[in-house]
Amino acid sequence: MKPRTTTRLRPVAGLFLVAALVAACSSSPGNTGSAAAGPRGAATPSTYQVGVIGGGDGGEPVKGGTLTFGAYAEAAVLDPARTIVAGSTGGLEMAAIYDVLMRWDSATGEVRPQLAKGLEASDGYTTWTLTLRDGVMFSDGTPLDAKAVKWSLDRYVEKGADEARLWKDNVTSITTPDDSTVVLKLGRKWPTFPYMLTTGPGMIVARSADEGGAFKPVGAGAFTFGSYAEHEETVLNAREDYWDGRPNLDKIRIIYVTDPNALLDTFTSGGAQAAFLRDPQLIDKALAAGFPGYMNMVALGNVGVINASEGRPGADPRVRQAMFQAIKPEVIYQRSYNGAGVASTQVFPSFSRWHTDATSLPYDPDKARELLKQAKADGFDGKVTYLGRQDPAARATALAIKSMLESVGFQVELDLVRSVADQITKVSVNKDYDVAGWGISWREAGPYGRMFATLHSKGNLSVGMHTGPEMDALIDEFQVAETEGEQRAVMGRIQEQWNKDVPALVYGPTPEFLTWRKNVHGVEGTVNSMVLLDDAWIAPTG
């Protein structure tokens, strides 16, 4: 494929599924993150880093072939306005079909143009001018011009997409002065706005996708939608007229293997050339076997959200803090994952560019007993319900939490549901829980969006957690900060405010590893554990 000509974006400061639960904090204050003591050959803390691990350029690309990818979950619909855009939920497929206006480069921490030609800020980061490439066409033959981009962005908001509220709260107008220019006016300063165009809003959907009643995935990416067999596979076909030249691969085949262990077996035996893993034990096995891949560490991916709604035990901040200081995450991870993974009670542990010297609340069961005693003196009966799932790892986690909370005086009832869907309904839709296994998921690349959605009082993903004016002000301050140093300073104060608010119990980050076989090359990582495959190719041996 020809070298890509891009206009480089001036560096911008910054780097829902329920998460798998990780482990290990210590009794010392401010645990910054460590690998739990696991089996011989397990990954070390330094292994769990954001970016591409292993592999090489492979030499001259080879044309042709089908890349079979074992997905983590089956996306119900490949529509960025209706599906959360992440590697675990159809992000690879959607990036292949729609491309993205901008791409985050994990090696440099910069946002770069991809489908777009450039993006420039003016008026103190309140105006962003998006320049489009000439001659880019959707797969239906219509042009991807400024009007098409505006239509897709408006559609994204109208359909109430994952980041629609954040977009609507900030973007005041979209104008198209000519076919290749889109001007976005913001209501407030936002230096890291380009990250919004690396995910759902940056996946431009053609008008024809909505024609005829049933949605059809139509974009300007390197591949087109071919076929879909429910619970079996999705097939994408290479485009001859992709703007950056025909991709090397002929097809991408996405297969759905519901059991994570079976998925790894399928991958290691050669039944797939790539696979998405989130279980730390399985990630350790893939790393120990020397498979390359794209690693992402999702901060707050493994938490117990606390319902702070009126009438719930968590409405009392003393109860929230008592639960936090009664939990030792290493116990959870030893029981659930045989000690694999990284553990920390900090918002952003030591692996992160957002890590600061601000410490988290320490494991302190005596302090937990004291706080619980105070709450009981004011009428709290000490009873809480923990919501989890029935699969072995989730059940082990729930039992560990029950044991630790009861050791300081709580009475814990377990509510273990059968599926992720049941858990989402209880937590996100009905808010029918006291404490629940969950993933808040603040991403290393451009964390502001998830910060706003989950912990700002205007956010749409707080699921009943405590929000307040102090945290709102800090999140707003993070948004307008211009340099990474300024942002990191705010993040330290966010950690300190977290210690006061205790919106959730923190067990550690979630590792997400999109691994591929050694003869696969040209895979590019971007945000939300997604990869781009327009330059990917498969060597005949390896």
Description of each model-found segment:
Residues 27, 229, 327-353, 392-402, ...:
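Detector for C-terminal structural segments
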Residues 127, 131, 165-207, 227:
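Surface-exposed binding/hinge segments that line
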Residues 211, 240-285, 411:
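Ligand-site clamp/hinge motif
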Residues 68, 144-152, 179-185, 221-222, ...:
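Alpha-helical secondary-structure segments
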Residues 117-161, 177, 183, 313:
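Aromatic- and charge-enriched surface segment that lines or borders ligand/interaction sites
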Residues 26-36:
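Bacterial lipoprotein signal-peptidase II cleavage site
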Residues 67-123, 216-219:
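N-terminal lobe/hinge region of extracytoplasmic solute-binding protein
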Residues 88, 197-247, 251, 261, ...:
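Gly/Pro-rich hinge or "lid" segments in bacterial periplasmic/extracellular proteins
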